[in-house]
Amino acid sequence: MSPAEAAPRKKHVRFARMEGDVDHDDQEENTLFDKQKDVKEGLKSVLKGGKGILSQGSGQVDVVRPGRSKTGTCWRWLVSLALCASFLGLGMAISVLGPTFEDLAINVNKNISNLSYIFVGRASGYIGGSLLGGILFDFVNPHLLLGFALLTTAFGMSGTPFCKKAWVLTVLMSSVGVSMGVLDTGGNVLILNTWGEQAGPHMQALHFSFAAGAFASPIIAKLLFGHHNSSTNTSLMSGHASKTIDAVLPFSHPKGTSTIDLPWMWAYIVIGAFVLLVSLLFFSLYFCISTNSNRTKTASGKQQFSKHHNTLIILLSMFFFFYVGSEVAYGSFIFTYGKDYVHMEETEAAGLNSLFWGAFAAGRGLAIFFAACLHPGTLILLSLVGTTVSSLLLCLFSQNYPMLWACTALYGISMSTTFPSGISWVEQYTTVTGRSAAIFVVGAALGEMVLPALLGFLLGHVQNYPLLMYLTLCTATFTSILFPVLYKLASPEGNVTLRKSSGKCTIKDADDSEYRQALLENMEEQEENESEADLCNDADFEVIEMDDASLLSSPKSSPPADVAASVPDVHLVASPLSEPNMLSFSTDSPRSKL
């Protein structure tokens, strides 16, 4: 045999199969692997629709959540504006009672000391409304519920000047307190449900609106519609104007008093009219926006709750008890402290009081911008450091004028962000439902009632010590110890990944990283399944022999005896050669190239 004839030739070997196996294999391919291919196609379509990008070498996928259209964003901004307007009215409605309390007592023919129980009635209604709102908010449309709460507040505020009996005024104030409690609870939950992980700045704006309303209400009550001397008003008003006012406002002459005008009542009417307009806005939102709330849910459709959900809610409510109680106590008694203990003039003490509330409102305004770039936990830590340092300095330098002014401003700014930041912080670890928000508000309301009353009782018995500063230091220390405990419960070891992120949704968000990891694992699994399906489903294949003499000369090129015996039918499409060198197989897969 010549060397040319001994050279290996290219051979094509095709395995034959029975015709009856064709339908069986096709059916097997359709039934076993079609779903896997469909899953991959569906995954690709989801990635395409969600604008997911798989970067080679990075192992990361950018996930852009659906439902973030421009129209949806506009509606969410409208809800935020409506909530801010409602909290502006809430702040005005709560704080207007103080500047007009003496006028209300005159209107119902009572002394101030005999009418103080209306504060208790309103506070009791506020707590009851918070609990009621927390229950109803999980079952009733939030826009409709807040609309009715604002409507009740509007009618209560407008009807307050018309109350001629003390018990009627107390009942009315209690009903207004109920509606305020519903509004306070529902507003905090709705802003979380509307914005989700982006709720931080909007939560700060919500509570800034409340502070702005509380700041503006005394101005409306006293500067715009303040009580003027009766003789002065008589000299300025013509007889025709006086008769007109008497005809329209017959209640302006209380029984047993001389002719007196009550212009302060217009403050209640103006506030009531404003709240009424906001309630109409919420009714409009009810008819324009679907009832679906954006609660955070898992893939199974259930809300996500922390393992220590109940403990977190109770401890955070205790945290708010001391925080709000200290805030109200300082704002209520700093005037008395400056006048009696530091021996300030009344104007200086009033300026110190105004400095605290002004710094408080300014801090909440600045927190809107800081919340967009800082984590809520960071804001809480900064607040705790500020309150602790300022209260410690106030205790050490309790009679130092410059230190008193500087630390009062620092204390007001530090206290401003704690409540909204606390709600935003706990929302990252567990779902804040209506009941949870109700517990927060009730804790804050109880602190507002208990700590100022306790401080007032102590001041009546101990007058030579700066009890106000001691109270602020104790509450700041307690909250500084309690917050690390809350953080430990919320982020136990091995589960420190946040469920949601605050601020903008970026590639480093914890929840997006979970989605990316899930998508990557699914894609790898689908690729493996598809590869296996392609290998197993192809019963027809060709084995192409390479023009490689060394391959045929290798002793490993001969197939094992059992493999050669298992070949059902071989059709040679070439000149025959020696049988041992005819075929070569790989044990990995029947679809290999030799």
Swiss-Prot record:
N-terminal signal peptide: none
GO biological process, one term: sodium ion transport
Entry membrane topology: Multi-pass membrane protein
Top-level lineage group: Eukaryota
UniProtKB keywords: Cell membrane, Ion transport, Membrane, Sodium, Sodium transport, Sugar transport, Symport, Transmembrane, Transmembrane helix, Transport
Subcellular location(s) per record: Apical cell membrane
A Pfam family assignment: MFS_1
One annotated Gene Ontology cellular component of this protein: apical plasma membrane
InterPro entries with a match to the protein in the record: MFS, MFS_trans_sf
SUPFAM superfamilies to which the protein is assigned, alphabetical: MFS general substrate transporter (SSF103473)
UniProt GO molecular function: symporter activity
Transmembrane segments: 77-97, 115-137, 144-161, 166-186, 205-225, 269-289, 311-331, 349-371, 393-413, 439-459, 467-487
The UniProt record lists the keyword Transmembrane helix: yes
Family of this protein: Belongs to the major facilitator superfamily.
Role: May function as a sodium-dependent glucose transporter. Potential channels for urea in the inner medulla of kidney.
Protein name as it appears in the record: Sodium-dependent glucose transporter 1
Annotated source species: Danio rerio
Gene field: mfsd4b
